């Protein structure tokens, strides 16, 4: 089926979203044009506004409309001296939803990946190094993903912490709550055994 240039352009633009291929993009475009033009206009306006007005927090690098985000500007979040290092702003949302962490964050916006040309300065480790030098951080909690790149990134940051005599800890990895051992992969099970803790 031959489509108009504008429609092709819309479908191509929609494909920038993760998990959206040609068919999904076509379905979305047709839905907006056929059934929800008002929603399409609202989406276009919201996207345009967000791309212009949402930037990065000067302290933790998460997304915010201000120079400093609401977490970093909260004096109570500084009291325990804890800094949780994550790979993306989505990780902050997940951790905040638990209600278990009351410190501050630092967002890497990725992980070390030499094969892809992503080095320490590309993920803000020079900025993190400067923050460690300031002396107001007593513990860095490494919450990078349990991938090869995430582990390598955590090890690199742990070395930075050692240089500044700041405690570094790694979030636990293991068997999910409600999970069955026979269904858990070997690597996860190994992490569970190595990260076990005493009950008495």
Swiss-Prot record:
Residues 81-176 form the Toprim domain. SMART domains: TOPRIM (SM00493). The keyword Manganese does not apply. Keywords: DNA damage, DNA recombination, DNA repair, Metal-binding, Zinc, Zinc-finger. It comes from the Bacteria. GO terms for biological process: double-strand break repair; recombinational repair. Disulfide bonds: none annotated. One of its GO terms (molecular function) is DNA binding. The keyword Zinc-finger applies. It holds the Pfam family RecR_HhH. A zinc finger (C4-type) spans 57-72. May play a role in DNA repair. It seems to be involved in an RecBC-independent recombinational process of DNA repair. It may act with RecF and RecO. Belongs to the RecR family. This is Recombination protein RecR. It comes from Vibrio cholerae serotype O1 (strain ATCC 39315 / El Tor Inaba N16961). The lineage of its organism: Bacteria, Pseudomonadati, Pseudomonadota, Gammaproteobacteria, Vibrionales.
């Amino acid at each position: 089926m031959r489509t108009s240039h504008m429609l092709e352009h819309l479908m191509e633009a929609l494909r920038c979203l993760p998990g959206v291929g040609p068919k999904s993009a076509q379905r979305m475009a047709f839905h907006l044009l056929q059934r929800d033009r008002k929603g399409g206009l609202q989406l276009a306006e919201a996207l345009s506004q967000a791309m212009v007005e949402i930037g990065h927090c000067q302290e933790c690098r998460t997304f915010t409309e201000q120079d400093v985000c609401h977490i970093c500007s909260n004096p109570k979040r500084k009291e325990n001296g804890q800094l949780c290092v994550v790979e993306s702003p989505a990780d902050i949302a997940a951790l905040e939803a638990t209600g278990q962490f009351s410190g501050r964050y630092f967002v890497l916006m990725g992980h070390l990946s030499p094969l892809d040309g992503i080095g320490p300065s590309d993920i803000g480790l020079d900025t993190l190094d400067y923050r460690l030098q300031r002396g107001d951080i007593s513990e860095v909690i490494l919450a990078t993903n349990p991938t090869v790149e995430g582990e390598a990134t955590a090890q690199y940051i742990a070395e930075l912490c050692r240089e500044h005599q700041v405690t570094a800890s790694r979030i636990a990895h293991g068997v999910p709550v409600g999970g069955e051992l026979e269904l858990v992969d070997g690597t996860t099970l190994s992490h569970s055994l190595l990260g076990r803790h005493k009950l008495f």
